[in-house]
From Swiss-Prot:
EC number: 3.1.-.-
Main EC class the enzyme belongs to: hydrolase
Protein name: CRISPR-associated endoribonuclease Cas2 1
Domain of life: Bacteria
Organism: Moorella thermoacetica (strain ATCC 39073 / JCM 9320)
Record-stated family: Belongs to the CRISPR-associated endoribonuclease Cas2 protein family.
A Gene Ontology BP annotation from the UniProt entry: defense response to virus
Amino acid sequence: MYILITYDVSTETEAGKKRLRKVAQVCKDFGQRVQKSVFECSVNEAQFEQLKHRLLQCIDEKSDSLRIYRLREPAKKYIQEYGVNLTIDFDAPLVL
């Protein structure tokens, strides 16, 4: 499944700055950054649950915001990209 994650973490304190780094790192573990606080991920159900669990452990629900959008399948049919395309095609072969 393709998901889109957006977040807004309060960085007024050092603890908030640390939470922001943790949230970004968890998102990087599962997908790719498309904007400063926006990630696209291609995950299965088990990975999705793990991702959600890890993110919820990072945030402070009293001061932070986290949104996870599940994209309609087939996602490529509904995603339109314009301009510089720096995203990775998760379904394409990986050549090293």
